[in-house]
């Protein structure tokens, strides 16, 4: 009999094809997740921070998340960003200044805080992935 899907965890990360297998491996092997709700967008959670620059992106993103959160009521949320994100380089926020990792970690922290305010029953964790020599390291973002 197949294992029942895990409705206790929600994951949000970038849709990067390069990082997909690494995200999946991390979630499965390091965090022990076989099933989870997922939203994957270019830039990951960054779209959720664009209230003033691209308000429709932010509104739609939070609307999709609310739908999925209401559907399964997960108690755990995992947010993942990654190094060399093309959305951060070439997307609508590419003109913003500052090191990419610092910007992404700031966005991850902000979305984690917003998530906790919107869904206070959830534990939210954020990670930043870096790829070097074919291996990916996932650092906790605090």
For each feature predicted by the language model, list its residue ranges.
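Short Gly/aromatic-enriched secondary-structure transition segments
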Residues: 24-31
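Divalent-metal-activated hydrolytic enzyme cores
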Residues: 1-23, 42-60, 67-74, 86-142
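A short beta-strand-loop structural module common to alpha/beta enzyme folds
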Residues: 34-44
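A generic structural signal for alpha->beta connector loops
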Residues: 32-35, 121-123
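Short, conserved beta-strand segments within well-ordered enzyme catalytic domains
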Residues: 10, 37-39, 78
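Histidine-centered catalytic micro-motifs
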Residues: 76-84
């Amino acid at each position: 009999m197949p294992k029942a899907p895990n409705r206790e965890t929600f994951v949000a990360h970038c849709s990067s094809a390069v990082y997909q297998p690494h995200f999946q491996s991390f979630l499965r092997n390091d965090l022990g997740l076989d099933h989870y709700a997922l939203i994957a967008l270019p830039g990951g959670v960054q779209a959720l921070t664009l209230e003033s620059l691209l308000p429709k992106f932010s509104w739609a993103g939070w609307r999709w998340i609310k739908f999925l959160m209401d559907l399964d009521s997960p108690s755990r949320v995992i947010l993942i960003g990654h190094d060399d994100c093309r959305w951060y380089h070439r997307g609508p926020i590419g003109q913003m200044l500052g090191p990419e990792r610092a910007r992404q970690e700031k966005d991850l922290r902000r979305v984690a805080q917003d998530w906790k305010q919107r869904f206070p029953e959830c534990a939210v964790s954020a990670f930043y992935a870096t790829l070097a020599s074919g291996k990916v390291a996932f650092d906790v973002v605090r």
